Amino acid sequence: MQFSPVVASPKLLLQLCISTLHCIMASIISTVCYWTAGACKGTTSPVPPVDSNLDQRKVQNAMTPTSVNYHFTRKCNYKCGFCFHTAKTSFVLPLEEAKRGLKLLKESGMEKINFSGGEPFLHEKGEFLGKLVQFCKLDLQLPSVSIVSNGSMIKEKWFQKYGDYLDILAISCDSFDEATNQLIGRTQGRKSHVDNLHKIRNWCQQYKVAFKINSVINTFNMDEDMTEPITQLNPVRWKVFQCLLIDGENAGEEALREAERFVISDQLFQEFLDRHSSISCLVPESNEKMRNSYLILDEYMRFLDCRAGRKDPSKSILDVGVKDAISFSGFDEKMFLKRGGKYVWSKANMKLQW
């Protein structure tokens, strides 16, 4: 018996389809059995390689910039030998652009802004700084606005105009011996840095601004006993830093400072801390605690990543936003909390006792 081509053709096609389906099903079953067998035997299935840097950026992407240090200028009138944020540019953002960036930070969760330099009172004789301080307190309603300064450019009229909007003023003072300050480079002509410190402390008391002192411990002041003068000045906080090297700033071929001769060991730093352990307001910061525990914005509003011992900038928050820029900051939030980075930082909540 013979089948006509017309009748035979659909049957052949059906057989082909069934055969193909059998092959596909066999392949699927084989693959499932392979992975299942591997899992049952405790073997590890192949996984794509993990981009650790990407994972780190995802973690940092979710970070809140609670406390930010904005170094809006690099220019300074002092020449401290260990300075780790030197005058490599003279750039300062226009006021409105700086305000725009600060607003972005507030919208991302910033509670505290610290203005630093360089010397922040140098630009426009402190007016630029004053306007930023006022904007952050009045317009942004930030709980804490603070400044770090060498104190040489501060006038009483600045307190009269902007003191109400400032929570904390930190003055850098590494020694209470004028000869030592000369060696370090924290000096301006014949002016007494220590006398000026006392004057500013009195203005802080008069205009109700919390007074803080920052000291960098180095080879020239590590043996000094500062107990009596610190007790007399009675700051709300005495931040004591171990001298830190940053490549490209105070170390390396492209640096404007050579800070190697100022560096002290961990043991010598600890000995200084032990001698001053009776001072309750002392807040120590070793190199380990300091290096990655600050969110630092440079003059272009770029976050600076210090993990590699240098300052690697992100893109500006003005261009890419806070969320993207902060993912390249290298910020160690755990170390920030460990070093006491979050404290009572609004003068409204402080019991200022003079």
From Swiss-Prot:
Keywords: 4Fe-4S, Antiviral defense, Endoplasmic reticulum, Immunity, Innate immunity, Iron, Iron-sulfur, Membrane, Metal-binding, S-adenosyl-L-methionine. Its main location: endoplasmic reticulum. GO terms for cellular component: endoplasmic reticulum membrane; lipid droplet; mitochondrion. This is S-adenosylmethionine-dependent nucleotide dehydratase RSAD2. Constitutively expressed in spleen, head kidney and trunk kidney. Following viral infection, detected in most organs including liver, gill, intestine, heart, muscle and brain. The keyword Disulfide bond does not apply. GO terms for biological process: defense response to virus; innate immune response; positive regulation of immune response. It is found in: Endoplasmic reticulum membrane. Binds 1 [4Fe-4S] cluster. The cluster is coordinated with 3 cysteines and an exchangeable S-adenosyl-L-methionine. Its cofactor is [4Fe-4S] cluster. It is a peripheral membrane protein. PANTHER family: RADICAL S-ADENOSYL METHIONINE DOMAIN-CONTAINING PROTEIN 2, S-ADENOSYLMETHIONINE-DEPENDENT NUCLEOTIDE DEHYDRATASE RSAD2. Belongs to the radical SAM superfamily. RSAD2 family. Coiled coil: none annotated. GO terms for molecular function: 4 iron, 4 sulfur cluster binding; catalytic activity; metal ion binding. [4Fe-4S] cluster binds at residues 76, 80, 83. Induction: By interferon type I, type II and LPS. Induced by infection with Infectious spleen and kidney necrosis virus (ISKNV), presumably through type I interferon pathway. Residues 62-282 form the Radical SAM core domain. Pfam families: Fer4_12 (PF13353), Radical_SAM (PF04055). Interferon-inducible iron-sulfur (4FE-4S) cluster-binding antiviral protein which plays a major role in the cell antiviral state induced by type I and type II interferon.
